[in-house]
Amino acid sequence: MNTFGRELRITTFGESHGKAIGVVIDGVPAGLELTEEDIKRELERRMFCHIPVLNPRCEPEEVEILSGVKEGYTQGTPIAVVIWNRRVISSYYEELWMKPRPGHADFAYYLKYGRHYDHRGGGRASGRTTAAVVAAGAVAKKMLALAGAEVAGHIVELGGVEINASYTYEDVKKSWGRPLPVVDQQALDKMLEKIREAAMRGDSIGGGVEVWAVGVPPGLGEPHFGKIKADIAAAAFSIPGAIALDWGMGRALAKMWGSEANDPITVANGRPTLATNKIGGVLGGITVGTPIYFRAWFKPTPSVRKPQQTVDLAKMEPTTIEFKGRYDVSIVPKALVALEAITAVALADHLLRAGLIRRDKPLGR
């Protein structure tokens, strides 16, 4: 399906080379301030046009809110947003028709939809479709702010180069002032070199990102189905190219003795809390009030300028393809922005479920 969420539901639509990408957001209370500029601001964070090989399409985001907003405020009705596709060059993909790219969803889409799948630019499986998720995230982030919560992320690994520095949440937010959101300057320099190397080789690189959510109130999530971690993980794996996820200290935690891994419980400002936060803000599927943090990894972009073995499905014969069109050397930076967005959507959904944001009366005025 193309819908995510229970109380806050988003339905995305559109393909990479179609007329538009879009999203319908249902469940937003009336009275939330929202403009097209709010959405465009978030979309521009995913562009990275200052590093052309990360976004050769570099498409100015033309955003239109079609419904659900009047005079700068939400109406409590479904919000429909479209982002128009303008810089489309489908001719690059003509020779790839019925010749699925190794590592790409082309092959799976053929198995499911037959000849009817749209292969141009990756179609429905393109990273371009995450623009719709980012648009929904712009709304969800505003909803989180009502509860005093916010989301931010950074790149922790790219092309095998890992960060090696201690940092705080404030450092994560400040990293967005750099060419890429990386807290470690030495690692950033090496990552930029790796990007240049991949472009020269006609190849691609993967990597990992970390997303934080701070100010999230305790008590969100359910003991079994509806765990906050499960919902965020499901959302994370909806992003094209996602291959792995670590919550809190993740695999490092799995290697510890139980006595080391446990977060001691203490009292601060008259309230119980965790003295440390190795677990990443969630116990038993329920938030405990400490910061949420997790890491996700994304595979290298499947489209590369190197010969790759595939099958001509029209003839059922082996063949070789070499992509000649535009491609992102890495999807990791864009994926980070999408992961921030879908995390915000999942958390806003749970705030509505818990009654911490209500829809039965308008916000503000």
From Swiss-Prot:
Entry cofactors: FMNH2
UniProt-listed Enzyme Commission number(s): 4.2.3.5
Binding site for NADP(+): R46
Cofactor: how bound: Reduced FMN (FMNH(2)).
InterPro entries: Chorismate_synth, Chorismate_synth_AroC_sf, Chorismate_synthase_CS
Gene Ontology MF terms: chorismate synthase activity; FMN binding
Biological processes, Gene Ontology terms: amino acid biosynthetic process; aromatic amino acid family biosynthetic process; chorismate biosynthetic process
Disulphide-bonded residues: none
Family: Belongs to the chorismate synthase family.
Role this protein plays: This reaction introduces a second double bond into the aromatic ring system.
PANTHER family noted in UniProt: CHORISMATE SYNTHASE (PTHR21085:SF0)
Protein name: Chorismate synthase
Species name: Pyrobaculum neutrophilum (strain DSM 2338 / JCM 9278 / NBRC 100436 / V24Sta)
